[in-house]
Amino acid sequence: MSLTINSAFDGGNIRVIGQDGGKVDLEIVNDHQSDFYQWFYFRVAGLGGGERVTFRILNAAGSAYPFGWPGYQARASVDRVDWRMIPTRYENGVLEFDWSGDAQVAWFAYFAPFTMEMHADLIARIARRPGVAHRELGLSLDGQPIDAFTLGSGAKQVWLYAR
């Protein structure tokens, strides 16, 4: 079995440590300019035929939230639109999940990704709505716009941010 694993795309994050047959050893890479890590997202090509592949994230115990791994389920997709949870094990500091689908290419992630392209679509959609005022607060360290919306005129203010 010849697998190709890649994370060189928006939000992608994984390091391949080694592959031995149907077992792939991986590590989560630190967040940008940070000592912390938790997020993973990668693509695997060369799958299919129903052969089982076991992915093992060897450094899960050192992640930012290791107590979140027990009971956690990784996400998988064959089209990057529909994501499903797959059975995942956490034992002795290693996060492990199996894949045996028929698709030749699949993506795996900590949670269903929300890419910058999806973010831009959301900003465009909300900015067009009646009663919504948009303003750009500035730029992030990566040069991305920091958008703000004002809705309503009540006394209470709520700030939400996620990415």
Model-derived regions: residue spans:
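Structured catalytic-domain cores with a bias toward divalent-metal coordination
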Residues: 1-162
